[in-house]
Amino acid sequence: PTTVIFPESPMNFMYHDDREFQQFIGDFARRNNVSVLFNSAEPDSTNGKYFNSAVMVGPDGKKLDQYDKLYLLPFGEAVPWVLESIVPAFVGNFSYGREYDLFPLGDAKAGVMICFESHFGQLSREYVRNGADVIIEMTNDGYLGPTPVLRQHLANAVFRAVETNRPVLRVTHV
C-alpha cells in the first residue's frame, strides 16, 4: 500500500502539540514507506481554538498537508453563533475549516470528509470540481451502535459516490 488511513478518532490525538505522537507516526511512515492519513485536533492560529482535522504524513515522516473540517456537528463540535453566549463552550468549540484541501493518494487526488460531512453533497461535489479522483470518509461510528443512524450514515457515503461518480473509501471503527 502507499497510504494507511485511520478512522476519525475521539480527539485523543493532537499531532501539532504532541512530539511523542509526531515521532510515532513519523517512524511508522518511514519504517513502512507509506503516507499516513489520520484525524487530529490541530490549532487554529487565528483564535486559539482547534480544528477537527485530517493530517497526512508522508513516507519521509514529515507532515504533507492538513484538511480542517468545514461542516462541524452542531453542539457536538461547534455551537451555532447565535447561541454561543448561552450554551457553555465545553459543548463544542472547534473552529470551522476554510479550504477544500486535496491529498495525494498514490497517483490520484483525494478529498476527505470527516464524519458528519458525508451529509453534505456540496462538499464532495466541490472536491470533484477541484480535481478529486476519490473521496475518503473518516468516521467514528462506534458510538452509534446498531441504530438506524449507523445505516443512514453509510447510505450518505453511497449517495456521495453516486452523485460524484467517484469511489468513496469509508474508514470507520464499525
Language model features: what each stretch is:
Residues 1-174:
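Enzyme catalytic cores with a strong preference for nitrogen-chemistry domains
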